């Protein structure tokens, strides 16, 4: 049994008690990819994926890429690169980085643009059910049918709203405004009501929205629909960085309830990585890129080990010392695993599995391998007790459970 921290209940839970595990991790908006904050999040859920597989579960992992969104459009305008080209470039770079870092790819990886027809149907369904409403648009917006207006979710139709993040009203209002919300939009029933369908605006991309009119999807409904179509509703777990807890996961779960049977049973969040004293973020520009480290000749497995040295729920600051420690650990492990025989690995494997089963405790798992490596490299150890093939057993376990290729 793999127990993880459920952000909604602040308890450790078995997120997938049956023979299957279905989970969704919110993907990137493809500009400034892939920084170490991204990598830390996706390596966290890769550990969970591996632990579930090792436990014998049939795992289905679904993710998305938000390949049309305001920040992407703003970056494209600022750089003069067409937004589709920018999204494609950054998405491919993200794929390359994840492959280099040993992250198992999702079974289904859907772009926001690709999901537009499904989102249109979902928003129409919410309108018909009274879970959404139209808001008039400003002059010049709305294309050939401005009277249709933008569409917003009506949170008053969801009595369970707020149960994911469990925040007070003032905190929700503050975070909603900080993280892409529009609390002051005229015509909304409630300041927190989130956008479902944004009507066409001059200079912005738009798609056929059938009865909604031309436009593009809101952020939260995209993930709700992609998760529904890839996993079915409800599903076991939704994850991402802790900054997605509210409003994104709160809103997408609310939308999933409006679409029928609810969203994720468990919400799991990775802590944020800081750099130069601030959270690593695109807006601040204090980013360390996986691709830049790779281009500088850094072994991706050293990057992975540097990230795994911190518990996924902790918030911490990246420094050069983290990378140096990752490189040193990688070199020591490779040295310890170079022989045909070595110390018995039975307890080491059990310790790795136990650590991951206890809230994905990667530092403890690394410590178990360190202890085996220290013994293997000890020139004074009793080699008469060595087990033939033990280094291979440890190497395969490190690969399968920790995602570190040696």
Give the predicted meaning of each segment.
Residues 279-282, 286-406:
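Structural preference for alpha-helix termini/caps and helix-kink/transition segments
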Residues 1-253, 257-268, 282, 328, ...:
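NTP-dependent nucleotidyl-transfer catalytic core
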Residues 273-274:
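Basic helix-turn-helix/winged-helix DNA-binding cores
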């Amino acid at each position: 049994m793999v127990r993880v921290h459920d952000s909604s209940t602040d308890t450790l839970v078995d997120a997938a008690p049956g023979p299957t595990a279905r989970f969704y991790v919110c993907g990137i908006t493809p500009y400034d990819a892939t920084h170490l904050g991204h990598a830390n999040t996706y390596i966290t859920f890769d550990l969970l994926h591996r632990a579930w597989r090792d436990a014998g579960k049939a795992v289905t992992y679904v993710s998305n890429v938000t390949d049309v969104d305001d920040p992407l459009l703003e970056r494209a305008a600022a750089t003069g690169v067409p937004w589709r080209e920018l999204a494609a470039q950054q998405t491919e770079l993200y794929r390359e980085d994840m492959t280099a870092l040993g992250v198992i790819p999702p079974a289904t990886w859907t772009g926001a643009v690709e999901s537009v027809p499904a989102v249109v149907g979902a928003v129409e369904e919410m309108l018909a059910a009274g879970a959404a409403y139209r808001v008039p648009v400003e002059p010049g917006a709305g294309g050939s049918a401005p009277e249709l207006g933008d569409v917003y979710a009506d949170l008053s139709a969801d009595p369970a709203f707020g149960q994911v993040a469990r925040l007070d009203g003032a905190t929700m209002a503050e975070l909603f405004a900080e993280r892409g919300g529009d609390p002051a939009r005229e015509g909304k029933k409630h300041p927190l009501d989130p956008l479902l369908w944004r009507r066409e605006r001059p200079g912005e991309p738009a798609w056929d929205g059938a009865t909604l009119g031309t436009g593009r999807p809101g952020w939260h409904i995209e993930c709700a629909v992609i998760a529904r179509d890839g996993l079915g509703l409800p599903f076991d777990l939704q994850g991402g960085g802790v900054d997605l807890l509210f409003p994104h996961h709160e809103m997408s779960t609310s939308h999933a309830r409006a679409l029928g049977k609810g969203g994720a049973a468990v919400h799991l969040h990775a802590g944020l990585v800081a750099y130069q004293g601030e959270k690593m973020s695109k807006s601040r520009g204090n980013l360390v890129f996986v691709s830049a480290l790779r281009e500088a000749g850094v072994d991706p497995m050293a990057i992975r080990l540097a990230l795994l040295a911190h518990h996924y729920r902790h918030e911490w600051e990246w420094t050069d010392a983290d990378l140096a420690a990752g490189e040193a650990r990688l070199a020591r492990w490779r040295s310890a695993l170079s022989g045909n025989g070595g110390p018995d690995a039975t307890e080491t494997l059990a310790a790795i599995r136990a650590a991951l089963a206890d809230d994905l405790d990667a530092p403890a798992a690394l410590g178990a391998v360190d202890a085996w490596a220290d013994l293997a490299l000890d020139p004074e150890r009793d080699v008469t007790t060595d087990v033939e093939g033990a280094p291979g057993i440890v190497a395969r376990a490190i690969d399968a459970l920790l995602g570190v290729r040696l």
